[in-house]
Amino acid sequence: EMCIRDRSMTPTLHDDELVVCRKRGSFQKGDIVAFYYNNKILLKRVIATAGDVVDIKEDGTVIVNGKTLNEPYVDGKALGECDIELPYQVPDERIFVMGDHRSTSVDSRTKRIGCIAEEAVLGKVSLRIYPFKRIGTVD
């Protein structure tokens, strides 16, 4: 169980919510995963996996392997902080992650974080357990 301490995943997850993370196992595009970055646990959404080509337009539209992603979980599209060269091919054994709050999230769009090693993933966020009025699965 983890307590969320940032706003990069709003509107899906909010500050001070408690979530349950299923240890390791498999994950796929669209899943929210927890991983270590600089001794801190971050939560982000898997956008692409090894070999995929990611492109992000100025308006924030995300394209993976030539197909525009349907992202109902994103409130407002934004390019956000991005200093990688696009289009970008995800390296072997890595995943490309982005926060749902695109204008403020620092994620794989930056060289600072980059793509996440699959082995750094702690697990998939599967359940919100607090606040009680929002208890349920996380998509």
Indicate residue ranges for each PLM-predicted region:
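Soluble "head" domains of membrane/secretory-pathway proteins
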Residues: P11-D139
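Short, small-residue-biased leader/transition segments that mark boundaries at the very start
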Residues: M2-C3
